[in-house]
Amino acid sequence: MYGMVSPDPSIYGNSGHDNPPYYGAAKAGLIQLTRYAAVHLAPHKVRVNAISPGPFPPPALAERMPDLWALLNQKPPMRRVGHAPELQGAVLFLASDASTYVTGINLPVDGGWTAW
């Protein structure tokens, strides 16, 4: 492989929930663009995958906005927000030799948010 491209949509490209429809449509467009680019760039040995992060708020949010922090921790089925190393693991996988036959996917890292 010569390279890897990773657009960054979000979980709202897979599910609407409470965000405005234009936000979800834009994120869904990135996911579709990932698939399209993967098909057309694969012959050139370029992989294209996306990662859709769920809630990964900064830890300082817990002190500044405790009500929002509590809400974000209740939304995912895992009942907690993500931590940076968990998102980094997905990025490292897609950038590593372990995923040289993976292209055109959208990998949600969201604690199960988009599973329901």
Predicted regions and their residues:
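Short-chain dehydrogenase/reductase
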Residues: 34-35, 88-91, 95
